[in-house]
């Protein structure tokens, strides 16, 4: 084992993934294929605006671009004005980011008085969260680049499982390394080609953490007719949803059970809460409304602020993203006679 990455898990502890040297070489090869399919070339200068660290996205794309001989700017995420400065001064021709962060970059470009013609961007590889054709069109219009989707998950390898080519008619799967199946999410039985269901993947060459029929919980379908680009690998359609309750917020996997675990560990917090996800501008916003046990706490501004800060800090440790926390009166949130519907996702993706 030469490297370890991790993804979010339902318990709040990360799911740890191990890689051998052969795994890293295979990962680089898979990423290089998808980068070239998306239009990437040796002559490109690529800015990677994924966060570096245990998250697989940044290093996965990084080593793929280096494999094809491109110049890599490991900008990481955040400090967006600096990102734009780097992009302009270093002449970046390719951008790697979540689609929502790509759109936020476009807003900052505009605020800084920079025209898209002043940038040299020509392609964008976007992933880690769902995106619509409309979102891609906006990225194209605002940044002047050609956007493509790519797909992966840490348990399988990270990014590099599948990606769009320049014809954008499904994501080509590296099926010599990852064997895909579609199953009915209720019966768990395989279904016919072209039907929508849950994607299941078996790793064929991975050594550090092989997976046999791993349920991704992602809903898609397989496309087996020949692509106009000439590649003959099977393709998968855009992800249409999940078969579990996982949310993807700013590229991070978030489970309601993680949030509940944090809230229920705090004696001042009551048992009822709601989770609201919305997209403000082009960035996802996570808001958690939660009842306090003692209504008197709401009249003590100092104690209230301290508790909000404490809840936010604990959530940040578990979720790895910031959340807005609102403390409300006991018995003020909606009650449910059946299964509680605690999550409201207002994003239109």
Positions of PLM-derived features:
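Short glycine-enriched loops at secondary-structure junctions
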Residues: 24, 51-53, 100-101
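Conserved structural elements of the adenylate-forming
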Residues: 16-38
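Short acidic, glycine/Ser/Thr-rich loop/turn "cap" segments at secondary-structure junctions
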Residues: 12-19, 42-50, 87, 92-94
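Active-site glycine/GP-rich loop and adjacent strand/helix microenvironment
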Residues: 68-349
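Conserved AMP-binding loop of ANL adenylate-forming enzymes
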Residues: 35-70
């Amino acid at each position: 084992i030469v490297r370890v990455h991790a993804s979010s898990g339902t318990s709040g502890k990360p799911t740890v993934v191990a890689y051998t040297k052969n795994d890293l070489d295979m990962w680089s090869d898979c990423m290089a294929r998808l980068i070239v399919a998306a239009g990437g070339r040796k002559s490109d200068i690529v800015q990677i605006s994924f966060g570096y660290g245990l998250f697989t996205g940044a290093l996965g794309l990084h080593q793929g671009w280096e494999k094809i001989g491109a110049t890599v700017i490991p900008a990481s995420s955040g400090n967006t004005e600096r990102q734009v400065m780097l992009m302009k001064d270093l002449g970046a021709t390719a951008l790697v980011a979540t689609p929502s962060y790509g759109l936020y970059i476009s807003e900052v470009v505009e605020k800084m008085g920079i025209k898209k013609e002043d940038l040299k961007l020509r392609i964008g590889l976007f992933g880690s969260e769902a995106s619509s054709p409309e979102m891609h069109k906006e990225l194209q219009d605002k940044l002047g680049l050609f956007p493509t989707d790519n797909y992966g998950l840490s348990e399988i390898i990270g990014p590099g499982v599948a990606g769009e080519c320049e014809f954008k008619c499904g994501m080509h799967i590296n099926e010599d390394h990852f064997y895909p199946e579609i199953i009915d999410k209720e019966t768990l039985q395989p279904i016919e080609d072209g039907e929508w269901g849950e994607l299941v993947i078996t790793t064929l060459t991975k050594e550090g953490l092989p997976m046999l029929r791993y349920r991704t919980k992602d809903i898609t379908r397989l496309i087996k007719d020949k692509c106009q680009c000439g590649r003959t690998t099977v393709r998968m359609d855009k992800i249409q949803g999940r078969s579990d309750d996982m949310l993807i917020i700013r590229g991070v996997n978030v489970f309601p059970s993680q949030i509940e675990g944090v809230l229920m560990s705090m004696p001042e917090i009551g048992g009822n809460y709601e989770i609201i996800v919305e997209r403000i501008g082009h960035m996802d916003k996570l808001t958690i409304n939660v009842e306090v046990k003692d209504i008197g706490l709401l009249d003590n501004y100092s104690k209230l602020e301290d508790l909000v800060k404490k809840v936010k800090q604990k959530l940040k440790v578990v979720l790895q993203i910031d959340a807005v926390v609102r403390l409300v009166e006991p018995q003020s949130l909606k009650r449910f006679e059946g299964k509680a519907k605690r999550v409201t996702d207002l994003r239109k993706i």
